[in-house]
Structures are given as C-alpha cells and as structure tokens.
Regions:
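Divalent-cation
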Residues: 2, 6
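Large intracellular
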Residues: 20-161, 233-290
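Helix-termination/interfacial motifs at the ends of transmembrane alpha-helices
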Residues: 8, 12-25, 143-146, 150-229
Length: 290
C-alpha cells in the first residue's frame, strides 16, 4: 500500500510541478520513446537472467504491493508452533514429534497454523531441522551450522531478483540516452523544415532522457530497494526460528527457548513477554484462533 502511495507522490509531484510552470503534458506523451526504453530494458532482463530468476522477480514485484509477509501475528504463530513442538518433545521425548515433522500436512500441531503451512520454505526449514534433531546422531553445534547454511543459501537466492532489478534500473538512464540519440537523428533529418516541427522533435528526444532517469530513480530503483528490505525481513524471520530451535536442541526449556526467539524478533513487530506467555499457555487450535 505504501509503495502505491509513494509512486503516486513521485509522479504527482513531477507532473504537478511541470503543470505549475505551464508545461504541456501532450509533449511528454511519447509512446515511441517509451517503447524503445521499456522494450530494450525488457530485453536486457531476458538476456541476463534465467527463467527461475524472472519468476522470482515477478513474485518480488507482487510482494512490494502486497504488504509484508512477516507481520506481528506471523511471529506469534511461529513461536507458538515451536513451543507446542518443544513441549510435547520435552514431555514424551523427541520421537513424539517424529511423525509431525515427517508429514506436517497430517499433523494437528502444524495445520493449526495455515499461514505457516502455505510457506513451504519455512515448513521445510523447521521440519528438516527437527527431523535431524530427532535422529539423535548430530551435535547441536552441527545442527546450528546446517541452519546457518540453509539461511545463507536462501538469502542468496532472495538477493538474485533484487540484483537483477537493480541492474535494469541502472541501465534505464543509458537506454533513455539511446532513445534521445535516435530522436536527435530524426531531428537532423528534419533540418530545413518548419521550426515548430523541429522543436517538437527535439522535445521528443529530450523526453527519452527524462523517462530513463525518472523510471530509474523514481520507480524501479525504489522498488528494488523495497524488495531488498523484504529479503532482509525474511532473513530476520528465519533467524528467529534458528535461535529458538537451537536453544531447545541444546536443552533449554521450551518456554525459555521461544523467549530467546522472541528476543530476536525485530523491534517493530516484536510481541511482548506476557503476550507470548499467555499464548503459549493456550492449546494449539485455540491459540491459533486467538
């Protein structure tokens, strides 16, 4: 939502200021210049990126306008899920949660949290870690290294579409100059004609440079920055899961393990101690509805 507001503010301020100076909007409407810039930019994306990165880029663009994936409630649900798993494991032994982590779709503990069930990356991260812990043959330090490696790979993958979009954004001013140069070539061919016609062609050429710079610094650049921050938010979320699971695997009590996880939650969405404690005292499905 804020991204949409920001785009409206950017274009509103530019167009508004232009009109205040008695500018003619019709001069800025140059479809040919836009086709040159947008088409060349799309081509560079296709040249430089494999299909799976293009897919992630599209998903990232949709995420910019769809809001955060990790609000306060997502952290509460995740910590409650971990607490339920930790508590049952502490009471009945690690083997008690083996069936849950082997097939979470049949686990009442997991299915009580639909948002987590929809995120297969998070589901695999939790289940793979706890499945390794239930084997009993791996040291806590080694499990923590596995989680760190998993997070590193996932974060690198999340950074790829951001880098791709940033590269496109950086190329737009240059592509705008390409469009402007082509406009100048056309203008040179019209020399000797009416001054009004020459002036119109010069204006059209300058619009190419204008569009390239505007789309770079006013649209795609900020969108790429937003996607990068979303990737950082996701990494912070995985860090919360990691420290909570690592604490429990080392032998920490369930409530203290999720408290360690809570301390790792970023400040703007961090739940309070008492809020998390009350939630953990509730039963699984009841807590999920709270």
């Amino acid at each position: 939502m804020f991204a949409i507001i920001g785009i409206v503010v950017v274009f509103g301020a530019i167009v508004g200021g232009y009109l205040m100076e008695k500018g003619n909007l019709h001069v800025l409407l140059q479809p040919a210049e836009l086709i040159i810039i947008a088409g060349a930019a799309a081509g560079t994306v296709l040249i430089s990126n494999p299909p799976h990165i293009l897919k992630k880029m599209a998903q990232g663009l949709a995420g910019v306008f769809g809001g955060t994936k990790f609000p306060r409630q997502r952290y509460l649900d995740s910590l409650k899920l971990l607490f339920d798993l930790f508590s049952r494991s502490r009471r009945e032994g690690l083997s008690a949660i083996e069936a849950d982590v082997e097939d979470p779709t049949k686990s009442k503990t997991f299915t009580a949290f639909p948002a987590i069930m929809k995120d297969h990356h998070v589901l695999n991260f939790i289940c793979d870690t706890l499945r390794t812990a239930t084997s009993g043959a791996v040291e806590p330090f080694d499990i923590d290294q596995m989680m760190e490696l998993d997070m590193e790979v996932h974060h690198q993958e999340a950074a790829q579409p951001v880098a791709a979009l940033s590269t496109v954004a950086d190329s737009l001013p240059g592509l705008g100059i390409v469009a402007a140069v082509l406009g100048v070539v056309i203008t040179m061919g019209a020399l000797g004609g009416p001054p009004e016609e020459i002036g119109h062609k010069v204006a059209a050429a300058l619009v190419g440079t204008f569009l390239g710079i505007l789309l770079c610094y006013g649209l795609l650049g900020p969108i790429a920055s937003n996607m990068a921050k979303s990737a950082d938010e996701e990494n912070a979320y995985y860090h919360v899961l990691r420290v909570a699971m690592n604490a429990f695997i080392k032998g920490t009590a369930p409530i203290l393990a999720v408290e360690i996880g809570r301390r790792a939650v970023p400040g703007p969405v961090r739940p309070g101690f008492q809020e998390l404690e009350r939630l953990c005292r509730k039963k699984g499905p009841e807590a999920a509805a709270a």
